[in-house]
Amino acid sequence: MDIVSRQKVRRFEAGTFQEIESSVATEYPLTIYVNDQELVTIVCTPEHLEDLVVGFLTSEGIVRGPGDIDSVDIIEATGHAKVSANFVNKFNAKYRGKRYITSCCGKSRENFYFQSDASLVNVKQNSNLKLTTDRIFRLMEKFEQNSATFHQTGGVHNAALCSSAEIIYSRMDIGRHNALDKIYGRALKDGTATDDKAIIFSGRISSEILVKTAKLGCGIILSRSAPTELAINMAEELNITTVGFIRGDRLNVYSGFERIT
């Protein structure tokens, strides 16, 4: 399925209108069924969908990890993801229902977001990863080079998992949470250790994005944008280093200063 479509638009430039074709990000509703019970519909970008399903179910505490999942069957034509699981968290099972998560990740997401996050309050990240400012600038440059769909459409979020030397996975989605869930799902499926890795994110570091980073087990998050006050407070509590406004040869470190040299 195409992740970008071409649409006719009227562009106003230099005092006149002209008809052109513009690239637009595809918006795709994916309904997840767990053991034949409808759980949720996520509006997403239609690529790396199995990664999204595994990452979402684990991140939201529906399952404990990929070992609880026997199979994931993605039916693109109908927009269904059918999951067979050998274990489903009983605490979260009561939240099953026809919920709809939009690409803007608004109030509909909160029903899921706060279910399994309370346990994170006292879970501090013990990452030993340290990054130099020069290494951060190089990683961000590579990240930007891997953001072709964003530059083409301006309508997606990008995320990456990286070591101190290289970017390991890059994922993009119209939903900022989805991009991180895709990273999480891929890492879980591959058995990739994350405690010595960092997250690079294209957008604002909100409290939700900070929590996603904590769930991934990463001790550093990097962004071209800024964190919110709540995200900084949570980062200090969870021992996560937040670095924002990475542009050109400057950056701001908001928490976890000892990991950046």
Swiss-Prot record:
Belongs to the FdhD family. This is Sulfur carrier protein FdhD. One of its GO terms (molecular function) is sulfur carrier activity. It comes from Listeria innocua serovar 6a (strain ATCC BAA-680 / CLIP 11262). InterPro entries: Cytidine_deaminase-like, FdhD. The active site is at 105 (cysteine persulfide intermediate). It is found in: Cytoplasm. Required for formate dehydrogenase (FDH) activity. Acts as a sulfur carrier protein that transfers sulfur from IscS to the molybdenum cofactor prior to its insertion into FDH. HAMAP family: FdhD. Mo-bis(molybdopterin guanine dinucleotide) binds at residues 245-250. Keywords: Cytoplasm, Molybdenum cofactor biosynthesis. Pfam families: FdhD-NarQ. The keyword Cytoplasm applies. It comes from the Bacteria. One of its GO terms (biological process) is Mo-molybdopterin cofactor biosynthetic process.
